[in-house]
Amino acid sequence: TEVLVQTVVHELDSGADCRVLDLCAGSGCIGLAAAANLPNARVLLGELDDEALKICRQNIRRNDLTGRVVSLQLDAREKPPTHLGEFDCIVSNPPYIPDGDIAGLDVSVRDYEPHLALKGGADGLDFYRDITRLWTAALRVGGRLLFEVGIGQADEVLRIMRSVGFGDLEITPDLNGIPR
């Protein structure tokens, strides 16, 4: 996730006004870190889960970013509301664990993380398909769609993105050298 934040900051001009959407925001850490490093960015934390949204709002206040960061209940698997407008960057670390793998997760994850934040469909790629297909319409011309992907999913996510017309794609390894 650190590398994803670095990529967002690198892709956007730190001095320019820009709009960033952190979709499937969870606690909001990606969007909040982007806002902290991009002083002219306006960031929307989009999250479906009510409890996660409460945490997003607390984190916005704790980080003193209430003037530039807002949170909103959004479903990444549905078409974006038109009133949101367009974004320079949509970033997402969506649920990517195949549904059948949930039972085998470490207890510290399986029993304490909301399954809504983990379950990515039969192959773990449902959110990538939906976000790429539906949310591209909310990107400005030349905008960036950035994902964190599960281990072993990078090539398939690239294929999904190419299938809707994305070019100039790259995979960045995480701090352990794993394509994410």
Residue spans for each PLM region:
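Conserved SAM/SAH cofactor-binding pocket of Class I
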Residues: 2-104
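Structural signal for short hydrophobic segments within the conserved structured cores
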Residues: 70-72, 116, 170
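Conserved Class I SAM-dependent methyltransferase catalytic core
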Residues: 122-180
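Class I S-adenosylmethionine-dependent transferase superfamily signal
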Residues: 8, 34, 109, 131-135
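Mobile active-site "lid"/loop adjacent to the S-adenosyl-L-methionine
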Residues: 96-126
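Alpha/beta-hydrolase-fold catalytic nucleophile elbow
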Residues: 93, 112, 148
